[in-house]
Amino acid sequence: MAQTLQMEIPNFGNSILECLNEQRLQGLYCDVSVVVKGHAFKAHRAVLAASSSYFRDLFNNSRSAVVELPAAVQPQSFQQILSFCYTGRLSMNVGDQFLLMYTAGFLQIQEIMEKGTEFFLKVSSPSCDSQGLHAEEAPSSEPQSPVAQTSGWPACSTPLPLVSRVKTEQQESDSVQCMPVAKRLWDSGQKEAGGGGNGSRKMAKFSTPDLAANRPHQPPPPQQAPVVAAAQPAVAAGAGQPAGGVAAAGGVVSGPSTSERTSPGTSSAYTSDSPGSYHNEEDEEEDGGEEGMDEQYRQICNMYTMYSMMNVGQTAEKVEALPEQVAPESRNRIRVRQDLASLPAELINQIGNRCHPKLYDEGDPSEKLELVTGTNVYITRAQLMNCHVSAGTRHKVLLRRLLASFFDRNTLANSCGTGIRSSTNDPRRKPLDSRVLHAVKYYCQNFAPNFKESEMNAIAADMCTNARRVVRKSWMPKVKVLKAEDDAYTTFISETGKIEPDMMGVEHGFETASHEGEAGPSAEALQ
């Protein structure tokens, strides 16, 4: 038998991508230009299509050398994501990660959405330790300089190992300071929403006044993040565990990492806080890590929602749900539901404290409630209760009911859904209002921890498709009537056309007969 020789070059694919990145930075062999708010970025179609489902679908439908992205995409975020498509590395300022996640979700880059969420949870966690991040779990935050990369071909070599990148990250004083910004939004939202009970006690555990009262003898240096750095030692000391040391230069707390014990999407603060639940202080201290991760997940979702809507620039305008228009046969049943002052007790036993906080108290059914605090998206108490009574514990049904409360049939029929998973290839159809979509998504995330944004994309696209079918069916009787009238008119015209030749034939025969009658006697006379 013939022998087979095999040769393998490690990291050859990475080297090719690095060289392609060098070509991109130098403007060599690029076959597409992506325009973002007037800024043109040259790239290779093959690399963009391999990294992003959005570009893959876009290039399948268009061969244009210039592609323009919507106004919701920011040039800085797209530049970082474009660099990620070539290098697999992300470099961003603290506080920009939420805008980056929004852009990655719009461009449908699953790697950033999956790994980035886990990485940002670790960074935002009070128990975060930069040395505990592994290569397979988190992307690097190493800053890269385009000037250094364009110096020549040697830049295509293997990048620095993760250990050196982590050490560089430790030397930055603001590497874990993204939590206070999200926390201020979260705390202010909870105060405005009137949230109380055990949930407020959990969130107060990580607030700045409580931490200052617990540790007055150890004020943190100005370069450190006081909220993030002091939270985990306080919890660890209360549980009888040694607190981690503080790095002098980086302000990063090293302590027992609890990020591996829980998943950010498997628990909910509302789920654990039933009306009759009781938590003693010892259990709360032991479960401090899990509660902290749960709260961090809520903060990231809230910050992601708020940052996305801030980019649209339309948060100042108030959005309200549509007035209810029900069929006569179901009007009595709906009226009984609208007369409810609060949610039924049996429904509360099933879903717990996962609904809007004002639904648990009696109130006017016509009262307008803000679906999510700070979004300016309002819905009446009766409509929201009808959504919950119809959905029960099924979050997908709740999502459909909420979308139907804000968008009528014609709006859905003339839309392409969320824009991420389009229900039509017609470029004239625009996505639904992003403010309503963000508010509904965040409300469903509070209701069901396992809610996925892809579910909303699919359901919205399905609702738009069904709305177009219903609108098309409603036009069918009118089209049939017009077609019947057109057929009758055509039949009348055809019959009229048949009558006219017959009349012409009769006249022609009469004239011929008269001529023959006149010619007959003259011929006989000649004879």
UniProtKB/Swiss-Prot annotation:
Residues in cross-link Glycyl lysine isopeptide (Lys-Gly) (interchain with G-Cter in SUMO1): 167
BTB domain location: 30-94
Example GO molecular function: histone deacetylase binding
Phosphoserine: residues carrying this PTM: 188, 259
Biased composition (Low complexity): 225-251
Subunit and interaction comment: Homooligomer; mediated by the BTB domain. Interacts with HDAC3 and HDAC4. Interacts (via BTB domain) with CUL3, PSMD7 and RCOR1.
Protein purpose: Functions as a transcriptional repressor. Seems to function as a transcriptional corepressor in neuronal cells through recruitment of HDAC3 and HDAC4. Contributes to tumor progression, and tumor cell proliferation and survival. This may be mediated at least in part through repressing transcriptional activity of GADD45GIP1. Required for recruiting the proteasome from the nucleus to the cytoplasm and dendritic spines.
Protein name per its UniProtKB record: Nucleus accumbens-associated protein 1
